[in-house]
Amino acid sequence: MVSSVLPNPTSAECWAALLHDPMTLDMDAVLSDFVRSTGAEPGLARDLLEGKNWDLTAALSDYEQLRQVHTANLPHVFNEGRGPKQPEREPQPGHKVERPCLQRQDDIAQEKRLSRGISHASSAIVSLARSHVASECNNEQFPLEMPIYTFQLPDLSVYSEDFRSFIERDLIEQATMVALEQAGRLNWWSTVCTSCKRLLPLATTGDGNCLLHAASLGMWGFHDRDLVLRKALYTMMRTGAEREALKRRWRWQQTQQNKEEEWEREWTELLKLASSEPRTHFSKNGGTGGGVDNSEDPVYESLEEFHVFVLAHILRRPIVVVADTMLRDSGGEAFAPIPFGGIYLPLEVPPNRCHCSPLVLAYDQAHFSALVSMEQRDQQREQAVIPLTDSEHKLLPLHFAVDPGKDWEWGKDDNDNARLAHLILSLEAKLNLLHSYMNVTWIRIPSETRAPLAQPESPTASAGEDVQSLADSLDSDRDSVCSNSNSNNGKNGKDKEKEKQRKEKDKTRADSVANKLGSFSKTLGIKLKKNMGGLGGLVHGKMGRANSANGKNGDSAERGKEKKAKSRKGSKEESGASASTSPSEKTTPSPTDKAAGASPAEKGGGPRGDAWKYSTDVKLSLNILRAAMQGERKFIFAGLLLTSHRHQFHEEMIGYYLTSAQERFSAEQEQRRRDAATAAAAAAAAAAATAKRPPRRPETEGVPVPERASPGPPTQLVLKLKERPSPGPAAGRAARAAAGGTASPGGGARRASASGPVPGRSPPAPARQSVIHVQASGARDEACAPAVGALRPCATYPQQNRSLSSQSYSPARAAALRTVNTVESLARAVPGALPGAAGTAGAAEHKSQTYTNGFGALRDGLEFADADAPTARSNGECGRGGPGPVQRRCQRENCAFYGRAETEHYCSYCYREELRRRREARGARP
């Protein structure tokens, strides 16, 4: 029972009232008080307190709720042997207090990162899971044995788009995923083959322990906050049985970088990096009493690629790190290599004692993240794999794969070329290691997604020459590898004769290759049939045995010694998709079994046993990989990820997280709605305040204002009057005479002060943009137009109509734009001054209509932007018998601006041009 694991606290509320002071809390003191008041384990107490940001009252409340949880909510196996019947197993209050430092979440960004993941959905459940995992990892028989677990994200496709996006932002390192995908390092396999699942990087705490955090997340779904993996890493490097062998492998890989006197110092520094001690140390009493101010999150030393290799030995499973090869600056230029990417195998542990499913990590911006897949409704539709090659089908680096041996003399044997040659791993040897430690598979790439270079060629053309050259290169590579691996024995004439006989026999059997290849490719089979030679025989052996085990090749029985291998391989291979191998079913000899003799495949290989060192699986992988390097990219060489094994608390953690995420998502949506409503209310209030404001004065009375140039593009909208002539000078003079009788006092003052042309507008007319103002065709009895200041900002200085900005004027378009029936109304003279109410009606007759920029609204009384607004209207005198001065279109043809009487009804620019033209004309007279 959970209630038996968690004793009943005595006077919890009293303790909270006495001890809770958020300004002077010391975390060690709070932890001690919590343990003293509840009797809980320090690990559980610490998780509860950290989950509530060291709020003692809230942590005690969570503890009380946890006690009331029914046993059915937790697996029964965890409570075995933990009840009050065995008091000797109950932890003491001082147990596990010797931690490096207590973590606090003062930093808001760090707190968000630490509190948003699955591992913080329920601190109590995660603490129980951590304790269970720690008990499994401390098994007496295998002190470093780790159970095979692989974490998977829940299926998010069942949720709405908004909630799914919220969870992805909450759990996934978006920056890492985008960077690695754009670099072509991550999820390129799901692009070329839809049957492969995408891998997503989980958000990981960046405190220097991100490598172990990422490994813990990839297996169990929570961070390594108890430093279980970190301490195991340090212990293995310091006192582990594999210490010397690991050191030799590390030194061999670093041989070209260090000098002899630097080795011990480098190894000591490397050992210190793995320590579980943080960079910053604090006393247990929190310093001088100000625990909150003097304490901070511990930051650990960043780990290197060798620590990944040691971690593979601790977990006893391969580790694949997906990373870019070069570190780039902000401009994308590469300036430093990134050595982390590649494959790390537990080479110092026999393959039969290792887990074959690799742990996959991502590395970007000096930070590790766990790469996990997502559950699917139909698990058979997509498979979780990790390619062992890059997108160019080149094998990933195999780190620390060479051990020179105990008898290697550093500084002496380094110059022995013969001994160095024995230690160089060929591609064949690397593939053999991968087949030994992992479940490898070849995934067929659909023809429609293959790269152009990898498209199958026509089997009827002369493409056989290319295939023959490929076969020759494979034969030469095989010969070189065999001669290198068997350099002590050499290759005598008898072996060469056997090789020749084998090639002749392979040619006679080439007719059946296309039928026996299955998923390999019919096109490639036809090429092999033409003149493949050695490669056809290499593939023939494996596929023939697989088909015979499935009952598809009964007429080609093999030797008796291969029957066991045939039955095993036949049950594994699928003819339609891929061919995979398992380490538990290997015919490949492990590194520890090579000295005992040849493998079953070598013994049953007939005349090829001595000439070929590795199994048929390795031969097939080598041939396909070589073909991929030559352009025949039809398969992806990948390792299978086993996702069926999960720890007992996986479902509870996922359930708690989804519930918490739904609550946070609902709160976020509600906050957004409130913010939107507040913004809308503020906008409405601002609009109302703008409408109530007094009209703006566009200019100071008596001072001319320079005309404004439109901010829009330099496109001119004009009215070309081809059929009807523009108003002549006589009409202009009549209009000026009429305008003089209806001018307001303010207008007269302006005219008196502006005796000359209005300065200010210097750009030429074609580079300007404006709005067409057209006078009404007749007198209308309507109310005075609102002031300019009361209009919307978008209508105050209207833009040019977008639909006409890119096309020239035509009479048909002009007819649709104008509000008058004839062009003569544009030149209609204004009648004389009208007394009293007649003046008001006359002013209303000449109100202008404005076309705004795309709004389609006609604004009465809105004057042209380049012209001065009537003083009477700006002063609010509308309707009081004071009509403003009348403006007319510029007399110059094709000019869309307006002029005043003092400028002879030219616009200011045209008026200056007209004056200049007149001066030039007078100067040209004899």
Swiss-Prot record:
Keywords per UniProt: Cytoplasm, Hydrolase, Intellectual disability, Metal-binding, Methylation, Nucleus, Phosphoprotein, Protease, Thiol protease, Ubl conjugation pathway, Zinc, Zinc-finger
PROSITE patterns: OTU (PS50802), ZF_A20 (PS51036)
SUPFAM superfamilies: Glucocorticoid receptor-like (DNA-binding domain)
Cellular component annotations (GO), alphabetically ordered: cytoplasm; cytosol; nucleus
Positions of the UniProt region annotated as TRAF-binding: 168-410
UniProt-annotated binding residues for Zn(2+): 890, 895, 907, 910
All copies of domain OTU, residue ranges: 199-374
Location in or out of the cell: Cytoplasm; Nucleus
Region ranges (Disordered): 75-99, 452-514, 537-613, 668-768
Reactions catalysed according to its record: Thiol-dependent hydrolysis of ester, thioester, amide, peptide and isopeptide bonds formed by the C-terminal Gly of ubiquitin (a 76-residue protein attached to proteins as an intracellular targeting signal)
One Gene Ontology biological process: protein deubiquitination involved in ubiquitin-dependent protein catabolic process
EC number per UniProt: 3.4.19.12
Major subcellular site: cytoplasm
Span list, region Catalytic: 183-449
Entry keyword annotation includes tRNA processing: no
Molecular-function GO terms, alphabetical: cysteine-type deubiquitinase activity; DNA binding; K63-linked polyubiquitin modification-dependent protein binding; zinc ion binding
Modification type Phosphoserine: residues: 119
Sequence ranges of Low complexity compositional bias: 481-491, 576-592, 677-691, 729-742
Similarity comment text for this entry: Belongs to the peptidase C64 family.
Disease: Neurodevelopmental disorder with hypotonia and seizures: An autosomal recessive, severe disorder characterized by global developmental delay, language impairment, impaired intellectual development, hypotonia, and early-onset seizures.
Entry protein name: OTU domain-containing protein 7A
The gene coding this protein: OTUD7A
